[in-house]
Amino acid sequence: TRYHCVTGVQTCALPIYEIMGGKADPIQISAFLTAMTMKGETIEEITACANGMRKHGIHMEHDKDVLEIVGTGGDKSNSFNISTTASLVISAGGVAVAKHGNRAASSKSGAADCLEALGVKIDLEPEKNKEVLEKLGICFLFAQKYHMSMKYVAPVRKMLGIRTIFNILGPLTNPAAATMQVMGVYEEALVRPMAEVLSNLGVKRGMVVYGQDCLDEISLSAPTSVCEIKDGTFEEYVITPEEFGMTRCTKEELVGGTPQENAEITKEILAGKKGPARDAVVLNAAAALHVAKEIPMQDAVKLAEELIDSGKAQKKLEEFVSLTNKLAEEE
């Protein structure tokens, strides 16, 4: 296995195939990931790598138009699990959510860690997840279950502790092939390119967002750069918390901790606790509701607030925990 030149679509896709096929050793994987991070990835390279990773993964068959909301990670903010919490609000609004995630790579608590701490059974078989999606309009697709080849990469990512192309690839390889997506990225230079990659991969409507205070979500402490995808067209703009009646906070007010601590933050938000954490969830859930329902962002913010205040989002979590545990016992 030789990675003599990390440029060009073919040279980039080949290592991904070899890594996913278990043919590369940890030193080679580390060298490839570090070099790609230093070079910066092109739209074509990322698309090729995402397609390569999808081909090595397990697909979940379903007949719903599903949405994914996810951040790349790698922003070093250590915020609580905003998009994971938002996914429960979005689903409560009648939008089918296939949340694809993993355990923490470059933070303390990944989506899988947080949901597990909330009581959700995260490692159901695809057929059981299909049932959960059909009954509840939400499911969690544990990356390790669907992208088993990631076992070759996970230890190296953990050891490196830096953002790599896999921070980007994870959100691009949803096993349910989501056609709607809100994706947060860790640097502004990725906003438009990632929108183009998502469109290349079949996303019809979506938003790629970057909080200008280095947050891979819509920020409550700074303006957010957005590139919106509408059937192959792209619109770039900037939004601020004030536009939606939100008060800015500091990044520190959104810092999370262990999976248990982040799960507690999620529970408090869904129980109606007001404050910056709730507002961050509302804004990010609203982006997804705007994308899925094609309603103005202001209306989507009001809807997200209503879904929390009515208890519908909290009920969605309770149903999610109950059904996944029931199905896990049957396996």
Identify what each model region corresponds to.
Residues 13-54, 327-330:
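N-terminal Rossmann-like NAD(P)+-binding subdomain of aldehyde/semialdehyde dehydrogenases
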Residues 55-58, 79, 94, 116-123, ...:
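Glycine-rich anion-binding loops and their surrounding alpha/beta cores
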Residues 33, 80-136:
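A glycine-rich phosphate/pyrophosphate-binding beta-strand-loop-alpha-helix module
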Residues 19, 33-37, 68-73, 288:
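Short glycine-rich or small-residue beta-strand-to-loop segments that form or flank ligand, phosphate
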Residues 10, 25-26, 42, 83, ...:
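Helix N-cap / loop-to-helix initiation motif
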Residues 9-10, 24-28, 105-109, 278-283, ...:
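Short acidic alpha-helix initiation/capping motifs at coil-to-helix transition points
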Residues 1-12:
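Single conserved hydrophobic/aromatic residue that forms the stacking wall/gate
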